[in-house]
């Protein structure tokens, strides 16, 4: 058990699986009180039984439900110190701009970009009152580099998250609030496994361009989120925090 988040209250969306669940466990291990917001009510209820957490079933695209999530955190624990806005979707019908229809485009924008807007909007009043807080928004390597294996709406949504994060980080820097974009490269999660299964050739190409030769584990991305949530990153705000196995720094990956 550590103490890096001792006495802090953290809201983590998408906390029932993958990177979100890894972050829940890391934050708990470092002393935080954690509120999980997730659409999966069954998994959330099980985690509330298993771990010392509060679970709120939430559709992160619904303004009232998002407000209720953060209000629950404040009413239960007395503050909102950390918002890790991590919920996202990566649907199989989001591909090339030539084949992705408007419904798929809008669905991804709502889940990946509008949700972050709503969560920041809900968290900030508590943090302004407290005069401190850390917001971590899940962007992506796709926000800073183009990909030939396109997921057009996903890429655009994450670019929006990164731009919004920079603006909020600058706007609220003198209010004691830090806002950073966590930009993972490929991660081994149930979502990524779906994509691998649907396009094995694309997955092989993806793996070949990673200098470290593998996908990240959820715990590795969660460790970066923990750093950004803690006082160890006290002079970091409005940043793009890349955790990508060297992809963004490589021209030709090693053989």
Regions found by a protein language model. Name each.
Residues 2, 94, 226, 237-255:
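Short C-terminal tail/terminal secondary-structure segment
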Residues 94-97, 101-106, 206:
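Substrate-binding pocket helix/loop in short-chain dehydrogenase/reductase
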Residues 125, 170-174, 234:
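Alpha-helical segment proximal to the catalytic Tyr-Lys
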Residues 140:
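Residue(s) in the substrate-gating loop at a strand-loop-helix junction
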Residues 120, 157, 165:
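Active-site helix of classical SDR
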Residues 9, 16-17:
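Conserved glycine-rich cofactor-binding loop
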Residues 41-42, 58-69, 102, 219-220:
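The beta1-alpha1 cofactor-binding region of Rossmann-like NAD(H)/NADP(H)-dependent oxidoreductases
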